[in-house]
Amino acid sequence: MKRLLAALALIVLGSFTACKKSAPTLGLLVWEGYADPSFVADFEKRCQCKVSASYMGSSDELVAKLRGGSASNYDIISPSSDVATMIATTGLAAPLDLSKIPAYKEVMPQLTSLPLVKSNGNVYGVPFQWGPNPLLYDTTAFPKPPDSWSILWDPKLKGKVSLWDDLSSVYMAAQVLGFDKPDPHTLYNLTDDQLAKVKAKLIELKPNVRKLWSTGGELTNLFENHEVQIAMGWPLMTNQLRKRGFPIGETIPKENTTGWIDHLMITAASEHKDLAYDFLQYVIEAKTQKQVIAVTGYLPVNPGVAQYLTDEEKRNLHLDDLDNYQKRIYFWENVPRRDRYNQIWNEVKAAQ
């Protein structure tokens, strides 16, 4: 009997020990590059946890997953500035206790002062990365940087263009039509008449579009396989292609461009909020931001990162002329009629 009791005790003790040793898993639903092992591994080691990341291809995909009942699968999300306000005001994200994120005070005030993730006196998101949607091009096909988005409609580029399968393509066409003059905010508040003209303009572009892309890797492959020569993209693809030795160029055309501020939010359904706070603090620290931008090529939110960069790296990130660079980017805002915009974009894709 004693032997039986001793055996049972060992089993119970073993089960408890195994449970105690099991590492918590932090679930992320974020943009590509935002959970790269180069900086996540140190966090996992430091906090004795696992980070499980899923990646999204558009802001609408993120919203659909959160509304579709899978919010409980994720502790942290990285909405862009065009849906961050909606997420902050509809109970999908938890209000933040900023005292648990000391590095928040180090973030650029140009970003934290914006109302994008604030509601009823609470802050719901921490700026993480920001940047433009630039025009990317194969420098062997364009020895000089294209100076206008309108080049995408050049008949010589039939079958050589790629667009992001996202509402940013709607914003871009609206810029080509001049709807952002004199007020860039108009891009996110287009009338039905303006949207009809945007739709017609994008349908005109379809013969030139070889393929729409949804993830950064897709566009990188399209360039590497010489399937396209020019596209709207992200600095992430520029960074990836340069590392692979591809002759990629990146520019902001004369019409300027739209861009985004990606925030990290803790979901209301998160069961690991303390660990999520630790992650937010970790990734906006200056040292970690240096590792993040090495992967993404995006702009850091913590200006303290400059102490870890060479002069060339600062120039490549436009940190030597930050104010003027930001003026060329019309940051995404909440789109009150987002469903209508999506309808227009879907009609463009369906048009023959």
Predicted ranges, named:
Residues 134-141, 176, 261-272, 291:
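A bilobed periplasmic-binding-protein/Venus flytrap-type ligand-binding module shared by bacterial periplasmic
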Residues 84-86, 230-247:
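A ligand-binding cleft/hinge motif common to bilobed small-molecule-binding domains
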Residues 19-87, 220:
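Early extracytoplasmic/lumenal segment of secretory-pathway proteins
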Residues 325-352:
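Conserved C-terminal helix/tail region of periplasmic/extracytoplasmic solute-binding proteins
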Residues 258, 267-329:
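Mature extracytoplasmic/periplasmic domains
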Residues 196, 201-205, 242-268:
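Periplasmic-binding protein-like
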Residues 1-26, 352:
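Short, low-complexity disordered leader/linker segments with a strong preference
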Residues 78, 83-84, 88-224:
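Extracytoplasmic ligand-binding site segments that recognize negatively charged/polar headgroups
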